[in-house]
Curated annotation (Swiss-Prot):
Its main location: membrane. The gene is phnC. Residues 28-269 form the ABC transporter domain. This is Phosphonates import ATP-binding protein PhnC. Its EC number is 7.3.2.2. Keywords: ATP-binding, Cell inner membrane, Cell membrane, Membrane, Nucleotide-binding, Phosphonate transport, Translocase, Transport. Part of the ABC transporter complex PhnCDE involved in phosphonates import. Responsible for energy coupling to the transport system. The complex is composed of two ATP-binding proteins (PhnC), two transmembrane proteins (PhnE) and a solute-binding protein (PhnD). GO terms for molecular function: ABC-type phosphonate transporter activity; ATP binding; ATP hydrolysis activity. Disulfide bonds: none annotated. It is a peripheral membrane protein. Belongs to the ABC transporter superfamily. Phosphonates importer (TC 3.A.1.9.1) family.
């Protein structure tokens, strides 16, 4: 059971601020909209309407379908069935040009803030207006007085106007969150979608963020997904709850009771959902990991884009086996497997070490991507030009970086080290820098599939360049891998698309 609102008693709990007066007319309309990934239904057919100016909390435990629903609402994901209308436009009938214009009217606030750490608060805020400016332009100090005045105004509105010229990596976590909210506010959106902004923060900070969201986006349509309703209750008009991909309840915030929350979060009894059946059957003998825990390591691409679904499938198939998952670069993961600190690793590059065995798990390709706002030479560009473009790189131990450097060197077009404008220690930071227009980047296609579909980045065509990429499982040859490691690898093969 989650923590329950202290304000709640046996009857209804407190409602929204009196200042919130939703305007008539729908901002969002779903009619039987659902989403499936193969045989698994992430979101069952849902019919829902949210009025313009309404503030809605989207509640539910992890895996309930909240993020999938938000992706339908921000148009980055199409429904498998039913229809979605956003700000009066049927998404399925909207062409690419109008879809870009529609997305410009939608602001998002993420749990991962997607800020560029080496840039100032002002540069991050201005670069947030995707399709209208770029971080390269702001870094060149080409921000007009009018833009600078407006940035200061939105930073004042979130309480950090005095930090306008401070680098983001020198700000506190709370101040960075305010920069992210100011960036969205600067876009002047009609609809704001916030995905778990209260996750991983202490109760006092969660209350501050909830109040700030309500104040900063007053009068606009606001949808906030969360599994913690307490900080939001005083600031929303309505609570929509999901459980196992289906609507659990939809009611005014003032009518929410402790019983509602208890039923939402209590353990499900009865038959299992066939749509969420295990990927593999448990064997007749229990799978035991050495030391009681199966230690898995992964580099960014498999760790962030493949392993989450594999770990869930493994937990369903082998509920008695504990799994720990750690993320690092390919070199560090490989070294940890070699040293026995990990039982199994998932990496993007091989090491010529006879003590290690590699097995091909998934195929991918490395592509060159850029923000739509970044001006480049006419395409397709030559290898020599690609090697000299302003570039955002991963850290030296990255498997992607190693593969790209070796591939281009073999083609006689070694990457120019002087072209590196930022070395990002995490994939999320690299994508944020590219989206803001700082430079191009070589990335796994799997890692940017959502960004490509959403129009946040585009691929850059390069003459004669094709870089195949593999995701490998790495194990030690001796001692023989445990039954748990082998079972995990079997689940991975069944779960990961080719």
């Amino acid at each position: 059971m989650p923590q329950r609102p202290e304000a709640a008693r046996a009857g209804p709990v407190a409602g929204p601020d009196a200042a919130s007066k939703p305007a008539p007319g729908p901002a969002l309309t779903l009619r039987g909209a659902g989403r499936a990934y193969g045989p698994v239904r992430a979101l069952r057919p849902l019919t829902l309407e949210i009025r313009r100016g309404e503030r809605v909390a989207l509640l539910g435990p992890s895996g309930a379908g909240k993020s999938t629903l938000l992706r339908l609402l921000d148009t980055s994901l199409a429904p498998s069935e039913g229809t979605v209308e956003v700000l009066g436009q049927p998404v399925a009938d909207t062409d690419a040009r109008r879809l870009r214009a529609l997305r410009a009217r939608i602001g998002t606030v993420h749990q991962q803030l997607l800020l560029v750490p080496q840039a100032t608060a002002m540069q991050n805020v201005v670069a947030g207006r995707l399709g209208r400016t770029s971080l390269a332009r702001t870094l060149a100090a080409l921000v007009s007085r009018r833009e600078a005045a407006r940035v200061r105004a939105v930073l004042d509105e979130v309480g950090i106007g005095d930090k306008i010229f401070e680098r983001v990596d020198r700000l506190s976590g709370g101040e960075q969150q305010r920069v992210a909210i100011a960036r969205t506010l600067y876009q002047d959106p009609e609809l704001i979608l916030a995905d778990e902004p209260l996750a991983s923060v202490d109760p006092a900070r969660a209350a501050d963020i909830a109040a700030l969201l309500a104040r900063a986006f007053a009068g606009r349509t606001l949808v906030v997904s969360t599994h913690r309703i307490e900080p939001l209750l005083a600031h929303v008009d309505r609570v929509v709850a999901l459980r196992e991909g289906a609507l659990a309840f939809d009611k005014p915030a003032a009518a929410l009771t402790l019983r509602d929350l208890g039923e939402l979060y209590e353990a499900r009894r009865g038959a299992a959902d066939p749509a969420r059946a295990p990927a593999a059957r448990p064997p007749s003998d229990p799978v035991v990991a050495p030391g009681g825990t199966l230690r898995i390591g992964a580099s960014s691409t498999p760790g962030e884009h493949l392993l989450p679904s594999i770990v869930r499938a493994f937990a369903r198939a082998y509920p008695g086996t504990r799994v720990s998952l750690s993320l690092s670069d390919s070199a560090a993961v490989t070294a940890a497997v070699r040293d026995g600190a990990l039982d199994l690793g998932f990496v993007g590059a091989r090491d010529d070490d006879p003590a290690l065995a590699y097995e091909d798990v998934a195929r991918d390709e490395i592509v060159l991507v850029a923000a739509p706002v970044l001006e480049l030479p006419p395409e397709p560009i030559t290898l020599e030009v690609a090697a000299r473009l302003p570039r955002v790189d991963r850290e030296p131990g990255s498997g992607t970086r190693a593969v790209v450097e070796q591939h281009l060197a073999n083609m006689g077009a070694a990457l120019d080290p002087a072209a590196v404008v930022l070395e990002a220690g995490a994939l999320v930071a690299l994508k944020a820098a590219v989206v803001s227009g700082m430079g191009v980047a070589f990335v796994s296609r799997r890692a940017v599939e959502d960004d490509l579909r959403g129009g946040h980045v585009r691929t850059v065509r390069v003459e004669g360049l094709s870089i195949p990429r593999h995701v490998f499982a790495v194990l030690r040859r001796s001692p023989v891998p445990s039954a748990a490691a082998r079972a995990f690898l079997e689940v991975a093969r069944a779960e990961v698309p080719p």
